[in-house]
């Protein structure tokens, strides 16, 4: 059991970050904000994937003017990402956003920051301070010679101080780097200095394969130490994939469950079915299931029976046939050609039963009532 760090609670619309709330999964739309239909299409896809909070860039006043329409079509908390121009921040706040991502230090004169903070206070909108190694201020680059974890922490604390001086405390902080070791060091150091909730991620992690590994190592390490209240996986791919990877990281640590947890063997000389093909097909076919269930796809007698006994639904294949288990009990025998369809059918039935019963599955192994 991971003991999570205690942080303040910050409300982002109807979703709480910090204060012991479940770790939330975020993503960001990846199109021109002025293309409102496409923005809303991506947001709907993110909602279906389980995204808790979505961020949309507001690089110009023209983009900011689109937020009113985006707000109407968005059913999850909406965050606006603003830099440099305080007027853009005021415009998106008027549109009804739920959180503002800025760095107070790059908004301009103090009176401009005060206007933004006052507008956030009036509307109950929190601010995320987002420090990135790639855009660290010149003063910290001159002090340390290059982006460092210490420089990033100092930058974050500088921005926090600006807001605290204005008696504003609805703050979330992120302190990201594309270097996993640097990101880990920065979050560790920052967590010792503030009790604000932390938004955790590896920025510009890269393409799906390498970026998923970097994110799993970086985000996973920090979460395993009890640090972090919300996460965003940054990948050069469809935003829905970011959400899927985020949930897999949380599931791997037992911090939050959603959808199917696939348990499958890597295959070897003992296996007598095309297990790799079967396991990947099962994963693809079950992406629509949001009820947390453990599904095992095993190919031999060494570990197969044990995993089948522990999983909610399992397939144990051999010699061209498959044995199907539900709750550890064998319920059906099928051919290799039909085993995927049969397994998917049983999983869908199990998920429907759980939803109908009103029970909320948690943790690993058989679902437990909460």
Curated annotation (Swiss-Prot):
Keywords: 4Fe-4S, Iron, Iron-sulfur, Isoprene biosynthesis, Metal-binding, Oxidoreductase
Pathway the protein contributes to: Isoprenoid biosynthesis; isopentenyl diphosphate biosynthesis via DXP pathway; isopentenyl diphosphate from 1-deoxy-D-xylulose 5-phosphate: step 5/6
Record bears the keyword Iron: yes
Pfam families, alphabetized: GcpE (PF04551)
Enzyme class: oxidoreductase
Described purpose of this protein according to its UniProt entry: Converts 2C-methyl-D-erythritol 2,4-cyclodiphosphate (ME-2,4cPP) into 1-hydroxy-2-methyl-2-(E)-butenyl 4-diphosphate.
NCBIfam families from the UniProt entry: ispG_gcpE, PRK00366.1
The protein, known as: 4-hydroxy-3-methylbut-2-en-1-yl diphosphate synthase (flavodoxin)
The species this protein was found in: Symbiobacterium thermophilum (strain DSM 24528 / JCM 14929 / IAM 14863 / T)
Gene that encodes the chain: ispG
């Amino acid at each position: 059991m991971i003991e999570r760090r205690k942080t303040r609670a910050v409300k982002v619309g109807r979703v709480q970050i910090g204060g012991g709330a479940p770790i939330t999964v975020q993503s960001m739309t990846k199109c021109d904000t002025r293309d409102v239909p496409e923005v809303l299409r991506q947001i709907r896809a993110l909602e279906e994937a389980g995204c808790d909070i979505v961020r949309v860039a507001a690089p110009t006043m023209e983009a900011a003017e689109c937020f009113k329409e985006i707000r109407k079509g968005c059913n999850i908390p909406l965050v606006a990402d603003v830099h440099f121009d305080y007027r853009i921040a005021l415009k998106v706040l008027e549109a009804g956003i739920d959180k503002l991502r800025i760095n107070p230090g790059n908004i301009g004169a103090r009176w401009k920051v005060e206007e933004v903070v006052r507008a956030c206070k009036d509307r109950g909108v929190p601010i995320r301070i987002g420090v990135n190694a790639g855009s660290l201020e010149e003063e910290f680059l001159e002090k340390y010679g290059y982006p460092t974890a210490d420089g990033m922490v100092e930058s974050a604390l500088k921005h926090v101080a600006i807001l605290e001086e204005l008696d504003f405390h609805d703050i979330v902080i992120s302190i990201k780097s594309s270097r996993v070791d640097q990101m880990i060091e920065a979050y560790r150091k920052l967590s010792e200095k503030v009790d604000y909730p932390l938004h955790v991620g590896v920025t510009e992690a890269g393409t799906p394969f390498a970026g998923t590994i970097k994110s799993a190592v970086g985000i996973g390490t920090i979460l395993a130490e009890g640090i972090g209240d919300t996460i965003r996986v940054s990948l050069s791919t469809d935003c829905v994939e970011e959400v899927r990877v985020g949930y897999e990281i949380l599931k791997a640590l037992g911090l939050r469950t959603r959808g199917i947890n696939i348990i499958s063997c890597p295959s070897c000389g003992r296996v007598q079915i095309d297990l790799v093909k079967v396991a990947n097909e099962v994963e693809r076919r079950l992406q629509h299931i949001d009820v947390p269930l453990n599904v095992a796809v095993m190919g031999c007698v060494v570990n197969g029976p044990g995993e089948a006994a522990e999983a909610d639904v399992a397939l144990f294949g051999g010699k061209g046939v498959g044995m199907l288990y539900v709750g550890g009990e064998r319920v059906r025998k099928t051919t290799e050609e039909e085993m995927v369809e049969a397994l998917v059918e049983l999983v869908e039935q199990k998920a429907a039963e759980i939803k109908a019963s009103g029970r909320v599955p948690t943790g690993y192994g058989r679902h437990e009532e909460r």
